[in-house]
């Protein structure tokens, strides 16, 4: 997922995406703890995607506040 795709989404869609990423991150950490995770890089990818979503949510909130 890239930032361009995220900028096109609404804040509600971004919050939903963030919730999904948090669930995914939790499941990946659980799999790693039990030794079932084949690709540990997935944890890093999920964490960074969540950070991207949070950043864009904050940017949208700041621009909405500035325009008011």
Curated annotation (Swiss-Prot):
InterPro entries: Ribosomal_protein_uL29 (IPR050063), Ribosomal_uL29 (IPR001854), Ribosomal_uL29_sf (IPR036049)
Matching CDD domains: Ribosomal_L29_HIP
Gene Ontology BP, a term: translation
Cystine pairs: none
GO function term, MF aspect, one: structural constituent of ribosome
Gene Ontology CC: cytosolic large ribosomal subunit
Domain of life: Bacteria
One Pfam assignment: Ribosomal_L29
UniProt entry keywords in alphabetical sequence: Ribonucleoprotein, Ribosomal protein
PANTHER family: 60S RIBOSOMAL PROTEIN L35/50S RIBOSOMAL PROTEIN L29 (PTHR10916), LARGE RIBOSOMAL SUBUNIT PROTEIN UL29C (PTHR10916:SF0)
Family of the protein in this entry: Belongs to the universal ribosomal protein uL29 family.
Protein name, entry field: Large ribosomal subunit protein uL29
Natural source organism: Roseobacter denitrificans (strain ATCC 33942 / OCh 114) (Erythrobacter sp. (strain OCh 114))
Lineage: Bacteria, Pseudomonadati, Pseudomonadota, Alphaproteobacteria, Rhodobacterales
Gene: rpmC
């Amino acid at each position: 997922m890239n930032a361009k795709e995220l900028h096109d989404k609404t804040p509600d869609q971004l919050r939903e995406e963030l919730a999904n990423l948090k669930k995914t991150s939790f499941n990946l950490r659980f799999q790693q703890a039990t030794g079932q995770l084949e690709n540990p890089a997935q944890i890093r990818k999920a964490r960074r995607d969540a950070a991207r979503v949070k950043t864009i949510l904050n940017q949208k909130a700041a621009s909405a506040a500035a325009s008011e």
